[in-house]
Amino acid sequence: SEGGRVVLKPNLIRHFNPGEGSVESVVTHGAFLRVVADYAWLAVGRNGSVVIAEAPQQDCKWAIVSEYAGIDRLVDHFARMGLTLEVVDIRREEVDLVDGIIVGRVTLPGDPAGYRVVDLGDLSFFSESGLDAKRFRGADYDPGPTSEHHSNGRNEYLISETVLSSDLVINLPKLKTHKKTGVTLALKNLVGINGDKNWLPHHTLGNPEE
């Protein structure tokens, strides 16, 4: 509606493709985002706002992936029309990896609107999974935060306030294969609304039988 706020949630996973394909084959392209943004502004008008918000993988170089995906050109395109397309990197931290080892960390500005702790409690599938939270592993070496936020009845996630406070979120995933889930679609794409992915259990320590 007029004056509303719309968030576009693309998949900007990484600034490179670890496989043999191009970067464009693993990220949501700006040409697709532009068309959706056009319709978003038709809905909210010039008094409304349209935001691209994403939390790519922790080692992703935002400036590079933004260039590959055409985000910078998209911002310029709407600026020529007198419209400000906001772009938010939801991550609180970026890391440098060498051979899979973290060798450096950079604190990022994060979500300018802040974050909200969302506790799913018993509504989380983890609550009845029978899994030992002490064996949960997230996106970093330290298992502490992952276990802490998924124990004693808690199942907490640090979610972007930009996303939660918007009037509408339009999920714009990239259709591609995934080594764990088979395919990456809209549900998997929502991993990127988490400000700290170490709150999100990615793995469980142990062998397959355990």
Regions inferred by a protein language model and the residue ranges of each:
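N-terminal and secondary-structure boundary signal
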Residues: 1-210
